[in-house]
């Protein structure tokens, strides 16, 4: 039995979960998320918590068991607390500014780089070199953060670029000269 998959998912008050066929829908104070559960896995509600079960011990069922439990647990956390990622910009002249609900970056290119906020994502600019990506869908928050980081990845020689808060950038030494 999967150590992660067998753990029940606690359902906090204020969260409404409906299981219709293979679709699990989670409604909470921050919004609504839904997920289609793959065939052999079943999600059942028992005494104020959700239990994810699998019918057999086949390799596919075992691999999907823990995954499904974690995805549903992330949905419950998302609609109650939400998710956020803080990113920092390092480099002379590199900055970010809010343009309505979107962001505009100056990253050393000859033009500003606009980033539109997808549905369910909210940006918060704390300083010109620090901003936060907020949302209820953990996967979407991570995807948007990774796309923004990819606009100018941290340089291994000088460390300039967009990085996650607390990310350690491995630095290279560079040429030694004569």
Swiss-Prot record:
Keywords linked to the UniProt accession: Ribonucleoprotein, Ribosomal protein, RNA-binding, rRNA-binding
Any one Gene Ontology molecular-function term assigned to this protein's record: structural constituent of ribosome
Any Pfam family matching the protein: Ribosomal_L6
A single cellular component GO annotation: cytosolic large ribosomal subunit
GO biological process terms on file: cytoplasmic translation
Protein origin, superkingdom: Bacteria
Oligomeric and partner information: Part of the 50S ribosomal subunit.
NCBIfam families: L6_bact (TIGR03654)
Family: Belongs to the universal ribosomal protein uL6 family.
Protein name, entry field: Large ribosomal subunit protein uL6
Biological classification of the source: Bacteria, Bacillati, Actinomycetota, Actinomycetes, Frankiales
């Amino acid at each position: 039995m999967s150590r992660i998959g067998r753990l029940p998912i606690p359902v906090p008050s204020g969260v409404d979960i409906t299981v219709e066929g293979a679709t699990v829908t989670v409604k909470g104070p921050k919004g609504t998320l839904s997920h289609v559960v793959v065939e052999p896995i079943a999600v059942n509600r028992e005494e104020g918590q959700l239990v994810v079960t699998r019918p057999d011990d086949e390799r596919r069922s075992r691999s999907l068991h823990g995954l499904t439990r974690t995805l549903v647990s992330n949905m419950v956390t998302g609609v109650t607390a939400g998710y956020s990622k803080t990113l920092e910009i390092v480099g002379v002249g590199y900055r970010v500014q809010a343009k309505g609900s979107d962001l505009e970056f100056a990253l050393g290119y000859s033009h500003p780089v606009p980033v539109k906020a997808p549905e369910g994502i909210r940006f918060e600019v704390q300083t010109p070199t620090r901003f936060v990506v907020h949302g209820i869908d953990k996967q979407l928050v991570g995807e948007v953060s990774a796309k923004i980081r990819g606009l100018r990845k941290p340089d291994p020689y000088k460390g300039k670029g967009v990085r996650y808060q607390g990310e350690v950038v491995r630095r290279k030494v560079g040429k030694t000269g004569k």
